[in-house]
């Protein structure tokens, strides 16, 4: 039986989810994306400030599904037809530069006995937040500008590459079986093959049938997509890979299958479900879980968090001169803020680091703290620079 104790945390979280876009729309001097407001409200209501709500097992599971749905939507949102070519090549080069810089910094920190793994730390500094960048650009109707193309491409590589490499780290630090390697290679090869075919072939005719079914109470497309998400999420987790990779793969596959006008309505339904319910639960729960008191009382954390925040900005901002022919210096500065915004993948990577024993808990907490600050500060700066440009 569900008790009041079980239901109360979810009730408070849903109340905060309703308040977040309202508060976001009221802030005029400081432009805060509603995702940032969700995290702030979670911190405020959490056990370390007002103590109105704490993370229960049921809320933890809903948050985990919200994280999976976020990566599912991220994969679904990636438009390979649009990115295929110079945009993706340039963004991949930029990410490679970020990785080399991040690992180099990680090696220095390892010599200073701050981190255990230079690779995982460096990888953590190369992440981006496509799930935050795209909604901001969409809300501003700024998806077609050269800046938007660069920002989406940079964020895409900052999501995909770290997750793929992190899956290899999970395998190497576990007890790998041949099936683990086969599964990872199959996922990558399958996505590459599907991308190649989708850019050259018309999507299957059954999409029209699915579009008709979405008008009925059966909602067959939503059920099929949910089955795909659950299946890949389960399979990747069962074989020792990061389960988020499965959610991302499910979104990419569905996006490729519905990448036409018939898929617009299906996409709208997913956005309603994701951003209306599950994704806000993830971000609010992230805020609730954020140990503000512990960080405030830790001298090490107070030193590490701002340093890690600057490292995020440096590693992702350093490659922006690659875009000097397309973007002016102010747009490149804005691109650095956009690319350095990191949280969902960062949380996944720190979880991997803790579970495999190659990242210290306090370092993981400081990285997540830097990630939380990045989504509080960098999108607001990005909006300010873009608004200034529009004016």
Residue ranges with predicted function:
Residues 8-22, 79-118, 122-123, 176-192, ...:
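Entry/N-cap segments of selected transmembrane alpha helices
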Residues 16-30, 71-85, 131-144, 195-210, ...:
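C-terminal ends of transmembrane helices
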Residues 17-21, 43, 47, 73-75, ...:
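Alpha-helical transmembrane segments of multi-pass membrane proteins
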Residues 9-14, 56, 60-66, 91, ...:
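Structural signal for the N-terminal portions of transmembrane helices
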Residues 7, 50, 102-108, 159-173, ...:
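Hydrophobic alpha-helical transmembrane segments in multi-pass integral membrane proteins
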Residues 99-105, 125-165, 312-322, 341-352, ...:
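Short helical (or helix-break) motifs at transmembrane helix termini and adjacent helical loops
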Residues 26-32, 43-90, 205-220, 224-306:
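Membrane-interface junctions of multi-pass transporters
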Residues 32, 76-88, 110-115, 136-149, ...:
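Juxtamembrane helix-boundary/capping and inter-helix hinge elements in multi-pass membrane proteins
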């Amino acid at each position: 039986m569900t008790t009041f104790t079980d239901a109360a945390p979810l009730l408070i979280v849903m109340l905060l989810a309703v308040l977040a876009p309202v508060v976001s729309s009221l802030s005029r001097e400081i432009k805060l994306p509603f995702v940032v407001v969700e995290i702030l409200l979670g911190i405020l209501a959490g056990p370390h400030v007002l103590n109105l709500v704490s993370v229960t097992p049921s809320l933890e599971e809903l948050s985990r599904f919200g994280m999976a749905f976020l990566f599912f939507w991220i994969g679904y949102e990636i438009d390979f037809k649009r990115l295929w070519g110079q945009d993706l090549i340039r963004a991949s080069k930029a990410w490679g530069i970020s990785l080399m810089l991040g690992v180099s910094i990680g090696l220095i920190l390892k010599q200073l006995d701050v981190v255990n793994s230079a690779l995982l730390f460096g990888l953590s500094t190369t992440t981006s937040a496509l799930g935050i960048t795209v909604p901001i650009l969409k809300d501003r109707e700024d998806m077609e500008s050269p800046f938007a193309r660069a920002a989406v491409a940079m964020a895409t590589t900052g999501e995909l590459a770290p997750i793929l490499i992190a899956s290899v780290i999970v395998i190497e630090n576990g007890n790998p079986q041949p099936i683990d390697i086969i599964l990872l290679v199959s996922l990558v090869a399958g996505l590459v093959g599907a991308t190649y075919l989708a850019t050259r072939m018309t999507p299957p005719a059954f999409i029209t049938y699915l579009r008709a079914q979405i008008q009925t109470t059966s909602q067959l497309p939503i059920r099929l997509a949910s089955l795909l998400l659950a299946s890949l999420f389960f399979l990747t987790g069962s074989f020792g890979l990061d389960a988020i990779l499965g959610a991302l793969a499910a979104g990419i596959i569905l996006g490729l299958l519905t990448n036409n006008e018939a898929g617009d309505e299906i996409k709208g339904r997913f956005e309603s479900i994701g951003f209306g319910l599950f994704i806000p639960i993830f971000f609010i729960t992230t805020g609730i879980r954020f140990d503000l008191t512990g960080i405030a009382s830790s001298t090490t954390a107070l030193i590490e968090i701002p340093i890690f925040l600057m490292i995020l900005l440096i590693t992702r901002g350093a490659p922006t001169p690659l875009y000097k022919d397309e973007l002016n210096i102010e747009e490149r500065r804005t691109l650095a803020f956009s690319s350095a915004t990191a949280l969902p993948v960062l949380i996944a990577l720190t979880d991997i680091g803790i579970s495999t024993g190659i990242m210290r808990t306090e370092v993981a907490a400081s990285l997540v703290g830097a990630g939380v600050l990045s989504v509080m500060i960098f999108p607001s700066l990005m909006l300010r620079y873009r608004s200034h440009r529009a004016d």
